[in-house]
A protein has these predicted regions:
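NAD(P)H-binding glycine-rich loop region in Rossmannoid oxidoreductase-like domains
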Residues: 35-42, 46-92, 100
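Conserved Rossmann-fold NAD(P)-dependent oxidoreductase catalytic core, especially the SDR/UDP-sugar
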Residues: 92-142
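Mid/C-terminal beta-alpha module of Rossmann-like enzyme folds, strongest
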Residues: 213-281, 315-330
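Conserved beta-loop-beta element that borders a ligand/cofactor-binding pocket
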Residues: 113, 151-174
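A hydrophobic C-terminal alpha-helical subdomain
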Residues: 194-199, 204-209, 259-305, 310
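Substrate-positioning beta->alpha
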Residues: 96, 148, 181, 198-218, ...
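Glycine-rich "substrate-gating" loop/helix at the edge of Rossmann-like oxidoreductase active sites
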Residues: 139-141, 169-178, 195-208
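N-terminal Rossmann NAD(P)H-binding glycine-rich loop of SDR-like oxidoreductase domains
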Residues: 4-24
């Protein structure tokens, strides 16, 4: 791997993938949207190309001359005034990238999907790459578009394009400028505005391990295969307490909110967003329905086939807390 294109390069995971590639001496071309915030790329010796994955011509120019493409560009949203954009970017945009890679003779594509595109085991069961997708009726446009785009990638893999798929879990770590949903949980705890929890669990993973997983997938992944990039399965209660302990603050959970009550409250917020504010609500009933499941995943395949190892979660949380505090988030 000598030259690589990274779509979504200015994003949380994407910028860490860029850094991993640079550390290995790879020439990196970054595709960023016109006017997009690029703080995470400041100071890096990279080639910047402006373009939108919805524009086939721009994508075709971007892939020209690279041997590897890392496709991370995607829209993540719990609410939008017009949901068409999430399909245009996540599904059609992915199709544009895959077609450009096939036509341009790109040697390998690492396609960033999500655990959202994998099925959820019942109860507190642990899912793997083989768990059939079972979230069709959830009603989440994000979840559905991630699954549909993953199917596009697998279809191209079956028709001659060397594509390997990675499925990150819930990443956290430094440079989470947005912040991401996992990072926002940490920020809210540090600010003292979140001392409640709800049923469910997640798989947390250091974003730098996720980035490393992309490189390992490019080098060792099998065409047409999925690889879960996750580390530790943890109940939401325990995650809140762990962040509090690492941060040195009171870890008592004041209130555990029943899921039905959360759905009622978020339904009201969603109605206000739809009809009054036209701004994203704090949460939605669909997001609660998804997040209140136990989103537990097995990383065995990434460990055995990609050679992955993972950082200590507590040490990673400590670094994340320090980063947020040093930049005034809390």
């Amino acid at each position: 791997m000598k030259t690589a294109l990274v779509t979504g390069a200015a994003g949380f995971i994407g910028s860490h993938v860029v850094r991993e590639l640079l550390s290995e001496g790879v020439h990196v071309r970054c595709l960023v949207r016109p006017g997009e915030r690029t703080d995470n790329l400041d100071g890096l010796v990279v080639e910047i190309r402006e373009g939108d994955v919805r524009d086939p011509a721009a994508v075709g120019r971007a892939v020209k001359g690279v041997d590897t493409v890392f496709h991370l560009a995607a829209v993540y949203a719990i609410w939008m005034p017009d949901w068409s954009k999430i399909y245009e970017v996540n599904v059609q945009g992915s199709r544009n990238v895959l077609w450009a890679c096939l036509r341009g003779g790109v040697g390998r594509v690492v396609f960033t999907s999500s655990i959202a595109a994998i099925g959820i085991a019942p109860g507190r069961g642990v899912s793997s790459e083989k768990t059939p997708f079972n979230q069709y009726t959830l009603g989440s446009h994000y979840v559905l578009t991630k699954y549909l785009s993953q199917q596009e990638a697998l279809g191209f893999a079956a028709n001659g394009l060397d594509v390997v798929v990675v499925n990150p879990c819930f990443p956290f770590g430094p440079m989470d400028i947005a912040p991401t949903p996992t990072g926002q949980i940490i920020v809210d705890i540090l600010r003292g505005v979140s001392r409640f929890s709800f049923p469910g669990g997640i798989n947390v993973v250091d974003v730098r391990d996720v980035a490393r997983g992309h490189i390992c997938a490019a080098r060792r992944g099998k065409t047409g295969e999925l690889y879960v990039l996750g580390n530790r399965n943890i109940a939401m209660d325990d995650f809140v307490r762990l962040v509090c302990r690492v941060a040195g603050i009171d870890g008592r959970i004041v209130f555990k909110v029943p899921v039905p009550l959360m759905k009622i409250g978020t339904a009201a917020l969603s109605w206000l967003s739809d009809h009054v504010t036209r701004r994203p609500p704090l949460s939605t009933p669909v997001e609660i329905a998804y997040a209140s499941q136990y989103l537990y995943f097995d990383n065995t395949k990434a460990v055995t086939e990609l050679g992955m190892s993972f950082r200590d979660v507590e040490a990673s949380i400590a670094e994340s807390v320090a980063w947020f505090r040093s930049r005034g988030y809390a």
